[in-house]
A protein has these predicted regions:
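Small-molecule kinase domains that catalyze NTP-dependent phosphoryl transfer to phosphate-bearing small molecules
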Residues: 14, 18-27, 86-132
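ATP-dependent small-molecule kinase phosphotransfer cores
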Residues: 1-51, 83, 92
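Short, well-ordered secondary-structure micro-motifs
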Residues: 46-47, 74-77, 133
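Conserved nucleotide-binding/hydrolysis micro-motifs of P-loop NTPases
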Residues: 40-44, 67-74, 128-129
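Small/polar loops that bind or transfer phosphate-bearing groups
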Residues: 15, 37-38, 64-66, 124-125
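C-terminal alpha-helix
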Residues: 135-142
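A glycine- and Lys/Arg-enriched "phosphate-lid" helix/loop adjacent to the NTP-binding pocket
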Residues: 3-8, 53-105
Length: 142
């Protein structure tokens, strides 16, 4: 846990092997459902997740991609940094993570958008938090 915190505080992505193990350990006991936030972030993690779910005879029901522009993201994280004391809430880390998203995670989003379009939902993350939450709840209630 300490090693993970160091990696995340530097704005780096945790390795696929470590994250896949964590997900495997947690999902193996989640027979009634689960929510993944920030995973998968790479195509390799996506492949692992797909294979893992197939082995457990589980399916994804919803995939949300909350798309937000960099300026709005910086503003929200700055606000969060005033309310919470997180090591990873600084401008350098935010920029590193945003670049990682552009370079790796967007490929995962595109993969699911193209391969599972019936469960993939693009959400405008520039809207107010309440509006984003309301949109997600409406989709879940369908």
């Amino acid at each position: 846990a300490i090693e993970l915190r160091k990696i995340m505080s530097a704005g780096q992505l945790v390795s696929d092997d470590i994250l896949n193990k964590i997900v495997f350990d947690k999902l193996a006991n989640c027979k009634s459902g689960f929510i993944l936030d920030g995973y998968p972030r790479t195509l390799e993690q996506s492949s692992f997740l797909n294979n893992f779910l197939t082995k457990l005879s589980l399916n994804l029901h919803f995939i949300f991609n909350i798309d937000i522009d960099f300026e709005t993201l910086k503003m929200r994280i700055h606000k969060r940094s005033l309310e919470e004391n997180r090591d990873d809430d600084n401008a350098e880390v935010v920029e590193t993570r945003f670049n990682a998203y552009i370079n790796t995670t967007k490929k995962v989003s595109d993969y699911y958008k193209n391969n599972q379009p019936t469960i993939f939902y693009e959400i405008n993350g520039n809207n107010e938090i309440e509006k984003i939450t309301s949109k997600i709840i409406k989709i879940l209630e369908k």
